[in-house]
């Protein structure tokens, strides 16, 4: 992948129970494309991943959510895992953090259960998305359309279903984030009302 994200900083919002591959592989792809990534979490030191059916590895938190300024980031990555977004969506600071990216027309990528945060942030209406199948009703009830596809890009948001989709997810995430970077984040995303 070309280094089209050089000089850009991407927030990765996660907490304990994130799906290991859905954080680590996109993080690596972003860094290979030239971006600086920062893991942002309500937990201050380390968060523990979930690796398919058991606990995975710990990942260092770069900045605590309470200290993170979303204005300092060019884009947002929301990994899945059932526990991770389920906890984050109940955290008002995490929801505000996500809303900022839509209010400021910045691109967002969410995989698997990650789109739960988009539902909570009121950012689904008018978009077509994919996700882990159990989120289909939540997305539709929030005003979005849901499709069972490997990856969907809709109005500044990239979504995918599961870890098997990571290669396509990474490709489209890098393409969207690069396009936004080239445009100076010039309104690629619909603002949240």
Language model: regions and residue ranges:
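Extended, subdomain-level signal for the structured scaffold at the beginning of enzyme domains
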Residues: 1-104, 108, 116-128, 136-193
């Amino acid at each position: 992948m070309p280094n089209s994200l050089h000089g850009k900083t991407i927030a990765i919002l996660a907490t304990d129970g994130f799906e290991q591959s859905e954080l680590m592989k996109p993080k690596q792809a972003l860094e290979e494309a030239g971006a600086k990534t920062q893991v942002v979490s309500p937990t201050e030191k380390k968060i523990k991943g979930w690796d398919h059916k058991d606990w995975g590895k710990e990942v260092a938190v770069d900045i605590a959510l309470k200290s993170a300024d979303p204005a300092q980031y060019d884009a947002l990555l929301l990994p899945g895992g059932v526990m991770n977004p389920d906890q984050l969506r109940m955290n008002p600071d995490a929801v505000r953090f996500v809303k900022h990216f839509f209010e400021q027309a910045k691109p967002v990528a969410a995989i698997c259960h990650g789109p739960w945060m988009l539902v909570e942030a009121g950012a689904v209406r008018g978009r077509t998305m994919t996700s882990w199948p159990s989120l289909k009703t939540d997305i539709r009830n929030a005003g979005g359309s849901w499709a069972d596809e490997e990856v969907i890009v809709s109005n500044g948001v990239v979504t995918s279903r599961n870890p098997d989709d990571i290669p396509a997810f990474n490709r489209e995430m890098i393409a969207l984030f690069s396009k936004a970077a080239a445009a100076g984040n010039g309104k690629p995303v619909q603002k949240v009302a």
